Amino acid sequence: MEIEGFVQAQTILRTPKFQGAKFILQRNTAQIEAKYHFLQEGQAFGWLSLGPLEDASLTVIGRGVYDSIYDIGDAFSDKFTHQEKMKRKFEYKLREVYLDTAIPPFSFRIGRQQVVWGETDNFRALDVINPLDSRWHWTRESWEDIRIPLWMVRAIYDIGKIGPLEESFVEAVWIPWDFQRSKVTTDPRRPWAMIRGIALQVQEKPRSCIR
């Protein structure tokens, strides 16, 4: 069993025209990740052989967030009802939970997860499978922190060496039902609201497909 995590506090002040200052972010995050290898080198729990199944592990990631800006920031706390503040300042969720298995030359990851294709620092070219949560400080956060994990199946076929290529593989992703759009807010009362008037409608829910 492997367990790791972190506790993080982020505080940001805004100074309009360099006169005065007000809090626009005071976000406190705690995350814990547990990984259990119940099958290694073809042996489950150290004694049970499962044939061609070589490796298997279960990963669970949980996250809790408290954004106290809705309590200590007068510019925002006075604009919301108690019920609205409770909804916005707390977030508790099972962020990711997935099963990894390896049956060489195939490997599978099944569950709620992030899939990254061609990650870059400032824009997403191929890394568009998971939607984004852009409701808070989205311009300065890592993609990993603001991606929304989805329930899906990820499969990789390891081809190995082909000519000058030392490693090559084929990857497929199947999202059977978990369609979510990126989350943004245009509510001017919120500190990270986007420009009002942006269309946020999705015309059609896409069908289940393989990429």
Named regions from a protein language model:
Residues 1-3, 35-58, 102-106, 121, ...:
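Short loop/turn motifs that connect adjacent beta-strands in outer-membrane beta-barrel proteins
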Residues 24, 44-101, 122-123:
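Surface-exposed loop and membrane-interface regions of Gram-negative outer-membrane beta-barrel proteins
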Residues 143-211:
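Signature for the C-terminal beta-barrel architecture of outer-membrane proteins
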Residues 17-21, 80-85, 137-141, 210:
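Extracellular loop and loop/strand-boundary signature of outer-membrane beta-barrel proteins
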Residues 15-20, 46, 70-77, 121-127, ...:
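Outer-membrane beta-barrel translocator domains and adjoining extracellular loop/strand segments
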Residues 3-11, 58-64, 108-112, 170-176:
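Transmembrane beta-barrel strands of outer-membrane/channel proteins
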Residues 11-15, 22-30, 90-95, 147-151:
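Residues that define the transmembrane beta-barrel architecture of outer-membrane proteins
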Residues 30-36, 60, 96-101, 153-158, ...:
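Residues on the lipid-exposed face of transmembrane beta-strands in outer-membrane beta-barrel proteins
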